[in-house]
Amino acid sequence: HFPAKEALFEAVVTARITDLVSEARSRADAADPGEAFFGFLSRIAGEAAAKRDLPDAISVSGSLREDLFAALDLLLRRAQQAGAVRAGIVTSDLIVLLKGMFAGLAGSTDPAVHERVFAVLADGLRARA
């Protein structure tokens, strides 16, 4: 039981971020760093389409935010080192892009729209040949 609605929301957000951090860390040792990175972003995009509070969740502060950013940073750097993600992108850029995607899709319930927008985001992150 939670004393207030805010406490329940905080507990849900904490659990969601903790799960995302765990998944990102588990993907960090994948044989294909590009697939690990884009697969994780796809998971985030899919979850955002299903659970509208994810933008608030990735805006969390404190140690959860640090853990999430560190896990994203590790996946991002490994993908960049493997040549899968363009150089020059930093984790804070990635967060801005994700938040922008979430905001732009906030009113859409069409999964095809979410898939297309994520595909464009992912293509923009891919290293140029």
What are these regions (language model features)?
Residues 1-9:
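HTH DNA-binding helix-turn interface
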Residues 7, 35-43, 93-97, 116-120:
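Amphipathic alpha-helical interaction segments
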Residues 18-50, 61, 67-71:
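Hydrophobic alpha-helical connector segments
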Residues 19, 47-51, 55, 79, ...:
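A short secondary-structure junction motif
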Residues 54-62:
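Short linear capping/connector segments at secondary-structure termini
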Residues 66-85, 97-100, 104-129:
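C-terminal peripheral helix-coil segments that are non-catalytic and often amphipathic
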